[in-house]
């Protein structure tokens, strides 16, 4: 069985692909605004860890300054989000086999965002859910699970309202079934490049969050044993 955990965002979407709760792979999209030095660090990480995969995104298409229109803005959002979702889902598909029994676990929308930001992430999240249902699950909606952010934090032993850094600390202290995984080891070995004060740089925090979606399925199945 393969469980795909997804933490979707417009900036750094990430997925954890777990086979039989023993083997882990991660894939994450990297924003085009990433500095050259940090991109080089991520490229080195990828070269050293075959189970940590990054998709380096091209700059998004934008309207010419001073010529913005409402329709133009919405068209570009749709085009940019479609391209992002296509790349992300294609990357996930490249890491699973056609005969795999797949479960997809996705973090639900966090409503901390407001206004246009909430509208944008809701629109893009709907697109990635449909793409996963159509292209990965081949319409088998019963294999798609959506959990609230609080439920996923609880799965690793953090409070439902825990902040990102608290979740990171919990993961590093006790990663549960991901102990000795490439992600846990990589963060341990590269703390100076990944942690800045109490900020966990993307896409590593996003990759941790995607793992929580896998862990939630594992914990849920244990309840039926």
Predicted regions mapped to residue ranges:
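Phosphate- and other anionic-substrate recognition elements at nucleic-acid/protein interfaces
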Residues: 1-225
